[in-house]
Amino acid sequence: MGERCTVEGTVQSVIFQNEENGYTVLSLAVDGQEEPVTVVGCIPCAAAGEGMTVTGVWVEHPSYGPQLTAESVERRLPRDEADMAAYLGSGILKGVGPATAERLVERFGMDTLRVIEEEPERLQTLKGITAKRAMELSAAFRALTGLRQVMEFLARYELPVHLAMAVQRTYGDGAMQALRDDPYLLSREQYGVDFAVTDAIALSMGFGGDDPCRLEAAVLYELSHNLHNGHVFLPREKLIQAAAQLIGVETDAVELALDKLIERFGVVEKPIANVMGCYLPRLYQAETFVAERLVSMVKTPVEQLARVEKTIADIEQAQGVSYAPLQRQAVALAADSGVLLLTGGPGTGKTTSLRGIVTLYERMGLDVLLLAPTGRAAKRLGEVTGREAQTIHRCLGMSFNDLTGQVTFKKDAKDPLEAHAVIVDEMSMVDLELMRALLEALRPSCRLVMVGDPDQLPSVGAGNVLGDLLHSGVIPAVALTQVFRQAEQSAIIRNAHAVNMGQPPRLDSNQGDFFFLCRRSPERLVQTVVELCRDRLPKSMGMEASQIQVLSPTRRGECGTVSLNRALQAALNPPARDKAQKQWGDMVFRVGDRIMQTKNNYDVLWTRDDGTVGSGIFNGDVGVIEDIDPAGELLTVRFDDRTAVYTADLLAQLDMAYAMTVHKSQGSEYPAVVLVSAPAAPSLMVRGVLYTAITRARKLLVLVGDDGTPGKMAANDRQQRRYSGLRRRLKEGMA
């Protein structure tokens, strides 16, 4: 087993096939060999009767015996009439069974496939095949042929099969022609192929360096790529310069391409302050809608609650609390406003205020909906309020449009949420497009309370929604600033606020819940992190390793998450005979590993514990590998209350999560955090990263590394600018 070989033969039968991702198990009758071979791998649209040359590796399945795991497959059409009849009768064409297949081959022989594709009217000469049915068969066969052509084209450039299926869904029969006309379409958002790869494909096909397709693709790539940098738009001059630099051409040529895109593709150009901003159409629509809807909510009067102060006093008595002035103001403002922004750092009483607002709304007879951007944040929101909370995506009924490559939601203006009031926590994580989707799903009379910490890192997606709302001065807002006495006893909270004010955290050896261990060499630092997670914290604090999260500002370097994960996996989940594993590049996935999804994937299927089935695993979701099938082609991963199955071609989207970057930890809290303190890229050595990292720890934080880096980070309040027009549009809307 483990040997690589190449076999050639004819598909005898297809045992299993997943139409979503192409994963297939088939029996191959090998030329010159009596016993068939079981082949497993990504072989979409496989059918009995077709010929294949398969190159792969032998593995031993404990139940089914030897299997050839396909690495590459060359396919050919049936070579005789018997194979042709088997191929057509295999179910590859809906409605064509063995009997119809025999009749077709008997009539048209080896010319059958050409007749189906090019002369479908001749099929009507067979009894039972109408003109309509003949055209349906022809269309289905052309789609199948087209998919295979696209697969073969993309395979030459080592691009995955699921990409071929996505292109085929968009362009249908014209998919292959669309790729010939403009291979740069692969770099569009719904396909996500890196521009450099697409550019290499196009240039190898003979496209010129100044081809209009190339110029326009570079502009669109820069606009979509910079969404990941948080920009809603790009200034015209910066966009032109970036696109020209990307492909090495003069800016004049790119400027002409941009003008064409504005004319016919819908790229939007609008003045923002003193620059001309260029938007992708949907981002412009999102920005204008969010501004208009929020301004409308601010201006629209809401039903007032009689005797607000008396109600608040009753809530205080019932909950056994006494609100500070700002907390009382927040609860009262929630009663009188259609929209409210509640902000504050750790220990300032956001949770107490939030409970009060929820109770107030319930006493007003309002149906309250609690939401958060991530599953972990929603779970925590539910715990602190004692009510059910859910993710924004789940509440809105998120789905994915394969044709446009965009997320869609079932709930919108036509089918709004039933709630009278919606409360959203962790608003710093909400990007512009998610904000638009939420606002579209609210009834005109629905109240909205947004809660967050503006000093946390901004959303991964485009926009700086919380910051723009706060600094616009348009949205009624209460900023909680008082750190309460009980919270002041926590060194975690004291140090978080010190960092937020530009002061270095205190690095005393023992502060109860905040410890510092000085380790100047990378080797000793990594060794100490491993010891803390494997031995010291579990023994001294009674914590399981799963309750401890290692954070680092960076992925790269000796103290980055890649290096840390390698060491932590070896220490916490070493290989064992009874523990299945899968090699993927330079990574090994093993049963029991803590892993993280690194990009949004709307196609991964999952099943909840209650039997609910859905799809979509998102960037930052963390789970544990529960099972790896013996062939190494399927990984079962547990995400909180959901179980998802990954095929091998999706493993590139997974990473180890024993250690993660601070950015990936947004919206989460952990019982214990081990935070790496070591130099990294200048853009990461900033106050917001350190503040966010410290505030991830609930009970314990151990800072490991040099003693100079935390102070330097606290003193550096530089923030990467995000191009957004939301703040200005809000102000203009209220003018």
Regions found by a protein language model. Name each.
Residues 1-310, 316:
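Accessory, non-ATPase domains that flank or precede helicase/AAA+ motor cores in DNA-metabolism machines
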Residues 14, 54, 597, 625-628, ...:
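A generic structural signal for residues embedded in beta-strands
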Residues 46-48, 416, 589, 617:
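Short, well-ordered loop/turn sites that connect or cap secondary structure elements
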Residues 49-51, 592, 620:
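Loop/turn positions that initiate beta-strands
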Residues 233, 328-331, 336-510:
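ASCE P-loop NTPase helicase motor core
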Residues 311-338:
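Conserved pre-motif I regulatory segment
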Residues 454-615, 626:
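Conserved helicase motor core of P-loop NTPases
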Residues 501, 609, 619-735:
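C-terminal accessory regions
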